[in-house]
Design a protein with these regions (language model features):
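Non-catalytic terminal/linker segments enriched in charged/polar, low-complexity residues
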Residues: 1-81, 113, 241, 246
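Nucleotide-state-sensitive switch-loop elements of NTP-binding domains
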Residues: 41-47, 55-86, 108-193
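Hydrophobic anchor at the beta1->P-loop junction of P-loop NTPases
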Residues: 89-91
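Conserved lysine of the Walker
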Residues: 99
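Hydrophobic positions on the alpha1 helix immediately C-terminal to the Walker A/P-loop
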Residues: 102
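Inter-motif core of Ras-like GTPase G domains
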Residues: 195-210, 228
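Conserved beta-strand/loop subsegment of P-loop NTPase cores
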Residues: 205-207, 226-236, 249, 255-258
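Single conserved hydrophobic/aromatic residue that forms the stacking wall/gate
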Residues: 256-268
Length: 268
């Protein structure tokens, strides 16, 4: 620098440090874009248990683009012979009942006790105004989210009724083909008539809270009579007595809504 010459004895300028680029170099080279995959590529990756390709396949299935739907249909048809070998559990309940937190604890217990691989399909409600969805159920599953043998896929309901997403059945097929032998389906927060999940799973678990209604609410036909098991959650602290009362009320309700005598053991 000329400022370092003799006539500028009181001023010294050092060479600066080059700043790194803030642009991703892969983006600059054009490598960031995903390669267009064929149906065969998807199927090959799914059968190998590649969760990245599995996630992309689920996105493809959920897409409303006609071109994507054509490829998705071919992928599902090729994965179908490899599906049907899992244990499917549906978890439903009112908003705030603790479905996601319960899945986190129960899922870790299942993986530790029985091994295998677990897929969790968490359905979040979509906004009627913006059509968007937060997809925040995964944030409640802190342990499962980092477990190497688990796969958590949040999906928007996209206006679908019944507590599940439009393509939940197809997503189950893909997960089974990828080698997941245990699948949990978490519905959106439901009311009394959202029972679509029941027909998709082997065991349908209903999570309830104490103080959400009396016996009259319980004997109303709907989701209560479809549940294979009922759990009264958040039974601790000052809530123990209320939960015990709620369990008694639900057992009494099952006398009117169920035919089997052993159904009284469904409430815990």
């Amino acid at each position: 620098h000329p400022e370092n010459s003799a006539e500028y004895k009181g001023l010294t300028v050092n060479n600066g440090v080059a700043q790194p680029s803030i642009v991703n170099p892969y983006l600059k080279r054009g490598r960031y874009r995903h390669r267009q995959m064929s149906a065969g590529d998807y199927v090959e990756g799914i059968l190998k248990g590649d969760v990245t390709i599995l996630g992309r396949a689920v996105t493809l299935v959920e897409s409303t683009n006609p071109a994507h739907q054509a490829v998705a249909q071919e992928v599902i048809e090729k994965c179908l012979p490899h599906a049907g070998r899992s244990i499917r559990v549906g978890i439903s309940g009112v908003p705030g009942a603790g479905k996601s937190t319960s899945i986190d604890v129960f899922g870790i217990h299942v993986l530790q006790e029985y091994g295998g691989k677990l897929a969790v399909l968490a359905i979040d409600p979509s906004s009627e105004r913006s059509k968007g969805s937060i997809l925040g159920d995964k944030t409640r599953m802190e342990k499962l989210a980092v477990h190497p043998d688990s796969f958590i896929r949040p999906s928007p309901s996209a206006g679908s009724l019944g507590g599940v997403a439009r393509k939940t059945r197809e997503t189950i097929i893909l997960c089974e083909a990828a080698g997941f032998d245990k699948i949990f389906v978490e519905t959106v927060g439901v009311g009394q008539s959202e029972t679509a999940c029941h027909s998709m799973v082997d065991f349908f678990l209903l999570i309830q809270l104490a103080g959400t209604g009396d016996e009259l609410q319980g004997i109303k036909r709907g989701i209560m009579e479809m549940a294979d098991g009922i759990v009264i959650n958040k039974c601790d602290g000052n809530n123990v007595d209320k939960c015990q009362l709620a369990a008694t009320q639900f057992r009494n309700c099952l006398l009117y809504t169920s035919d089997a005598a052993d159904d009284l053991t469904r409430v815990d």
